[in-house]
């Protein structure tokens, strides 16, 4: 009896919800396919004029080398150039120093026989075609996927065999 009352109440609530949605949809003009089509009589809006460049103050083109194609009065040679840093020789002491970071970044600072200067096109530094860690990141993912697939297959097979043995009759011969 209680189940019949619950089903009747659910039916009434569902009917009221559908009736409310239908009434709201008929009264609203929110969705109209005519809104998606352009009016053929509309003229394109004119573009706003570009603002004039300020005469002084902060300018992003100052950060670009050579002025960024700047104004008429600027010359590319007016900006002071930083002094180039001479390479610092260092020995193979076995430790890590700041010059090792400069070698890896390809900024020089390496002694003779170092592979990280980047100018020889060796494996270290920025001169290489691809980073050394890229292939290493691919292999563990593939191995993990294969191991997960094999583990799933084995567990599935074991569950199938247990189910098969569970329903076997005690006195019958193996099939």
Swiss-Prot record:
Cytoplasmic side: 159-175
Region (Disordered), start-end ranges: 30-137
Superkingdom field: Eukaryota
Extracellular-side positions: 29-137
Predominant localisation class: membrane
Secretion signal, residue range per the UniProt entry: 1-28
Transmembrane regions: 138-158
Compartment(s): Membrane
Record's compositionally biased regions (Gly residues): 65-74, 106-115
Tissue expression as described in the entry: Widely expressed with high levels in lung, spleen, thymus, liver and spinal cord. Expressed on leukocytes and endothelial cell contacts. Detected in a wide range of T-cells, including CD4-/CD8- and CD4+/CD8+ thymocytes. Expression is much lower in peripheral T-cells than in thymocytes.
The keyword Transmembrane helix belongs to this UniProt entry's keyword annotation: yes
GO biological process assignments: homotypic cell-cell adhesion; myeloid dendritic cell activation; positive regulation of neutrophil extravasation; T cell extravasation
Keyword annotations of the record: Membrane, Signal, Transmembrane, Transmembrane helix
Role noted for this protein: Involved in T-cell adhesion processes. Plays a role in a late step of leukocyte extravasation helping leukocytes to overcome the endothelial basement membrane. Acts at the same site as, but independently of, PECAM1.
Family membership: Belongs to the CD99 family.
Description of how the protein assembles with itself and partners: Homodimer. Interacts with PILRB.
Entry protein name: CD99 antigen
Native species: Mus musculus
Gene name, Swiss-Prot/TrEMBL: Cd99
């Amino acid at each position: 009896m209680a189940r019949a009352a619950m089903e009747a109440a659910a039916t009434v609530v569902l009917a009221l919800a559908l009736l409310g949605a239908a009434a709201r949809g008929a009264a609203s003009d929110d969705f109209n396919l005519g809104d998606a089509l352009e009016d053929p009589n509309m003229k394109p809006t004119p573009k706003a004029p570009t603002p004039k460049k300020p005469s002084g103050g902060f300018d992003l083109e100052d950060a670009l080398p050579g002025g960024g194609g700047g104004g008429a009065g600027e010359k590319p040679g007016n900006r002071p150039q930083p002094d180039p840093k001479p390479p610092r020789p260092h020995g193979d002491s076995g430790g890590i120093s700041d010059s090792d970071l400069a070698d890896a970044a390809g900024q020089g600072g390496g002694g003779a026989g170092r592979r990280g200067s980047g100018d020889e096109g060796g494996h270290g530094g920025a001169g290489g075609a691809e980073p050394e860690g890229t292939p290493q990141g691919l292999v563990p993912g593939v191995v993990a996927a294969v191991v997960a697939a094999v583990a799933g297959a084995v567990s599935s097979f074991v569950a199938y065999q247990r189910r098969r043995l569970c329903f076997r009759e005690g006195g019958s011969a193996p099939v």
